[in-house]
Curated annotation (Swiss-Prot):
This protein is involved in the repair of mismatches in DNA. It is possible that it carries out the mismatch recognition step. This protein has a weak ATPase activity. Belongs to the DNA mismatch repair MutS family. The gene is mutS. NCBIfam families: mutS1, PRK05399.1. Disulfide bonds: none annotated. GO terms for cellular component: cytosol. Gene3D superfamilies: 1.10.1420.10, DNA repair protein MutS, domain I (3.40.1170.10), MutS, connector domain (3.30.420.110), P-loop containing nucleotide triphosphate hydrolases (3.40.50.300). The keyword Transcription does not apply. InterPro entries: DNA_mismatch_repair_MutS, DNA_mismatch_repair_MutS-lik_N, DNA_mismatch_repair_MutS/MSH, DNA_mismatch_repair_MutS_C, DNA_mismatch_repair_MutS_clamp, DNA_mismatch_repair_MutS_core, DNA_mismatch_repair_MutS_N, DNA_mismatch_repair_MutS_sf. It comes from the Bacteria. Keywords: ATP-binding, DNA damage, DNA repair, DNA-binding, Nucleotide-binding. This is DNA mismatch repair protein MutS. GO terms for biological process: mismatch repair.
Length: 858
């Protein structure tokens, strides 16, 4: 047996091999030692009498999914080695083989995962022009593909998808390996694709880009190789361009806490937490997808808004629809299990009950006065035949296992009914035999029983053994207080009953497989229905949230970038505050205002105001209503943020480097259609350095980018920029001082703040009084010194147009200052440099090389 084990293990050296032996899956050697530690199993040894006993640990086959999930959740792979023949009928060694390789990206059992989470496997291929990327959730069969120009873009997509595993076709650089490790992404090699596969041809039929085709073929090939079965539920790959949606980096999504709180990593405290009123797992997953990819297409946005408006206006339509949706199970994943062949009878009944809810939903929609709802209903196929087929074939409460009978209703199959009659008649005969034998022997407590080891038997207590007719009874088993016997007639009827039972069980399983295969024919229709119900679930949720929180329907204009939000609110902050206590604020930025320079004390609400604007924009572009009295918005193509102070552990960057990298991304790639949020730029370095950088960034945003930008700062000197920058406007968050106490007004007011109230905020934070007294003394001393210096309006000469100097070099006079080849090469290197793809250490090394080249050139 161990030779067979070692031969199979050679093929899967990087996976835990679960080797089936009887009712257990066994782990051996290093797998056993490591597995016992992780899974808290008892470590034993095989061949204890030898000098080198083999470490061994096992898990019951009935509970194997739990143990597999635990290992895969920790990033390991598990190869399931099954017995491929009945051990009782095997000649010699039982034939075994791998039936499935479970990996982080292919795990279908939810385990500890939230049912509203997707589990993506991603395939990446390198090409001459960049990268092809495709990803899939095996449990639902969905597949998407795109092509990207840089590994930085690939990295961002992987983080945004929260992918668990990447199939990569080439060697990774050390930097890429480090990224994958820190992002907790398992990297797997592609598997060779031999011959033609129907799944691959079907999936890639609509793809035209070569890189996307390669990535998709690699993805499906890996799935076929690891799952070792037909994957009929894989859907046609949908190609997308990242610029088809409102683009937000993974960092931006985290900063804005779209699906998880930045502090806890949990749902509570996120935008998803506020908006998720879905009642199905597939609706929850779809909502997450929408939040990650807000739309740019106004027509699609307007359609979603119309659906939400109709459900908001039609209270009874919405409530009846929601009540029916509560009875809908996860159609997408049930369909995946049907295709996968591991669906059980209870899950098929869940599918049937889900389908039985669809006519109720259609009735609710069709009774509405809204054309958009009735049109939506017309596109839904309720698949009544599938629901009826399942419900009339399976019993109401079938067992969990499909191999032990008790699945199929009476009357479904005539042969099955005959077997059942034989079993029932045999059992009636046993009851009658027990009565007859009591009378014949005079043993009142005589019993006829059954167990799997000895079959049917007659049990007599020790006190009545003397009455046993040994001429007819043969002793079978001795117990402490009784003896068990058999008779020729009992043995004959046992054979008849057990044969009927075995044949009945086998036939039931065959009938169940036939039912499953028949339902499998409807997989595309079931997937389409699942998508429709998921969308309807999200629409109902949006309508419910809008009603509960008094949201408004936003409008859009495509001919300008004007923003007009009246009494806007932060959707998350509002929910955690006492009802009615949130102070709303307007955001009004017309063609004469591109930048809001926001000042005010810490804790006053600057960051909340900025995030509020971004979240309103995102909510609007996914089709939700928004927290405001009214909102007229442009369609934003990108959102950039620099909010919060934290080191980037994944890329190994310091706080200041993160700050500069995020600022650079906005300065490089933002357009006039973008939204930029910068909070406290420059605080990670010396005061004057920070002030200089902040001022220069504001000026660049104003002069070169032209995006709508909200720029919060503590550098009050920057407020004089409105004298030279026409499209910049100063606003501040109001605060007042009463009886020595600072009171935040949380209201946005025009003009700059008159002071920062830093010491007051420190007092609110509970700093020691001695520290506060010393800070007050130092502040007065600095203010006294500052009064002797130039006024604030003159302190920003750094950002003013420099006066011409007599020794100034004329950059345009190339004849007087010709550029050397070395200088030109350095300039070209800098022009082509993509900073977001480099670490600080790499940049320092590049600068050192440039310095050396220029010195050598002299």
């Amino acid at each position: 047996m161990m030779e067979q084990y070692y031969e199979i293990k050679k093929q899967y050296p990087d996976a835990f091999l679960f080797y089936r032996v009887g009712d257990f899956y066994e782990l051996f050697e290093d797998d056993a030692v490591k597995g016992a530690q992780i899974l808290e199993l008892t470590l034993t040894h095989r061949s204890n009498k030898t000098k080198n006993p083999i470490p061994m640990a096992g898990v019951p086959h009935m509970a194997v999914d739990t143990y597999v999930n635990t290992l895969v959740e920790k990033g390991y792979k598990v190869a399931l080695c099954e017995q491929l023949e009945d051990p009782k009928k095997a000649k010699g060694m039982v034939k075994r083989g791998i039936i499935q390789l479970v990996t982080p990206g292919t795990m279908m059992n939810e385990g500890p995962n939230d049912a509203k989470d997707s589990n993506y496997l991603t395939s990446v291929v390198t090409t001459k022009s960049g990268f092809g990327l495709a990803y899939s959730d095996l449990s639902t069969g969905e597949i998407y593909s795109t092509h990207l120009k840089s590994f930085a873009a690939v990295s961002n997509e992987l983080l945004s998808l929260r992918t668990r595993e990447v199939v990569y076709n080439g060697p990774l650089t050390e930097q890429s390996k480090d990224f994958m490790h820190k992002a907790n992404i398992t990297v797997s090699a592609p598997t060779p694709i031999e011959g033609e596969h129907a799944e691959i041809s079907y999936v890639e039929q609509n793809l035209t880009n070569g890189a996307e085709k390669s990535a998709t073929r690699q993805l499906v090939g890996y799935l076929l190789s690891t799952q070792k079965r037909s994957l009929a539920h894989l859907q046609i790959a949908k190609s997308y361009e990242v610029n088809q949606y409102l683009q937000m980096s993974h960092t931006v999504q985290n900063n804005l806490e779209l699906v998880a709180s930045a502090k806890t990593g949990k749902k509570m405290g996120s935008l998803f937490w506020v908006l998720d009123k879905t009642h199905t797992a597939m609706g929850g997953r779809l909502l997450k997808q929408w939040l990650a990819r807000p739309l740019l297409n106004v027509d699609i946005i307007n359609h979603r808004e119309k659906m939400v408006q109709a459900l908001l206006d039609g209270y009874f339509t919405r409530e009846n629809t929601i009540d029916a949706l509560k009875g809908v199970y996860d159609l997408e994943r049930l369909t995946g299990r049907i295709a996968f062949g591991n669906v059980n009878a209870r899950e098929l009944l869940q599918l049937s009950r889900s389908l039985q809810a669809v006519p109720v939903i259609l009735d609710a929609l069709n009774q509405s006065d809204s054309d958009v709802l009735t049109d939506f209903a017309k596109k839904i196929d309720p698949l009544k035949g599938v629901a009826e087929l399942i419900s009339t074939t399976l019993v109401k409460d079938p067992p969990l296992l499909t191999t032990e009978g008790g699945l199929i209703r009476d009357g479904v199959d005539k042969q099955l009914d005959r077997y059942r009659d034989a079993m029932n008649n045999g059992k009636k005969w046993l009851v009658q035999m027990e009565t007859d034998e009591r009378q014949k022997t005079g043993i009142e407590n005589l019993k006829v029983g059954f167990n799997k080891v000895f079959g049917y038997y007659i049990q007599v207590s020790n006190g009545n053994k003397s009455k046993v007719p040994l001429d007819r009874y043969t002793r079978k088993q001795t117990l402490t207080n009784a003896e068990r016997y058999i008779t020729p007639e009992l043995k004959e009827h046992e054979n008849l009953i057990l044969e009927a039972q075995t044949r009945s069980t086998d036939l039931e399983y065959d009938l169940f497989v036939q039912l499953r295969d028949e339902v499998k024919k409807y997989i595309p229709a079931l997937q389409k229905l699942g998508n429709q119900l998921a969308a309807l679930d999200v629409y109902c949720g949006f309508a419910t949230v809008a009603e509960q929180n008094n949201y408004c329907r936003p409008s859009f204009h495509t001919d300008s970038q004007d923003i007009d939000v009246v009494n806007g609110r932060h959707p998350v902050v509002e929910k955690v505050m006492t009802a009615g206590s949130y102070i709303p604020n307007d955001v009004k930025m017309d063609s004469a205002t591109n930048i809001f320079l926001i000042t005010g004390p810490n804790m006053s609400g600057k960051s909340t105001y900025m995030r509020q604007m971004a979240l309103i924009a995102i909510m609007a572009q996914v089709g939700s209503f928004v927290p405001a009295d009214s909102a007229a918005l442009p369609i934003f193509d990108q959102i950039f943020t620099r909010i919060g102070a934290a080191d980037d552990l994944i890329s190994g960057q310091s706080t200041f480097m993160v700050e500069m990298s995020e600022a650079n991304a906005a300065l490089q790639y933002a357009t006039k259609r973008s939204l930029v949020l910068f909070d406290e730029i420059g605080r990670g370095t010396a005061t004057y350095d920070g002030m200089a950088l902040a001022g220069a960034i504001v000026k660049y945003l104003h002069d070169k980018v032209g995006a709508k930008a909200l720029f919060a700062t503590h550098y009050h000197e920057l407020t004089s920029l409105d004298e030279t920058l026409d499209y910049l406007k100063n606003i501040h968050v109001g605060a007042t001082e009463e009886n020595g106490k600072l009171i935040f007004l949380h209201k946005i007011l025009p003009g700059p703040a008159d002071q920062s109230y830093g010491i007051h905020v420190a007092q609110l934070a509970g700093l020691p009084r001695a520290v506060l007294r010393e800070a007050t003394k130092l502040l007065k001393r600095l203010e006294a010194q500052g009064s002797e210096l130039a006024p604030v309006s003159q302190q920003l000469d750094l950002f003013a147009q420099p006066e011409a100097a007599s020794d100034e070099v004329d950059d345009n006079n190339s004849e007087n200052s010709p550029m050397t080849d070395a200088e030109q090469e350095v300039l070209d290197d800098i022009s082509n440099l993509y900073l977001a793809d480099k670490t600080p250490l790499q940049i320092m090394q590049m600068v050192a090389n440039w310095q050396k080249d220029l010195k050598d050139d002299k």
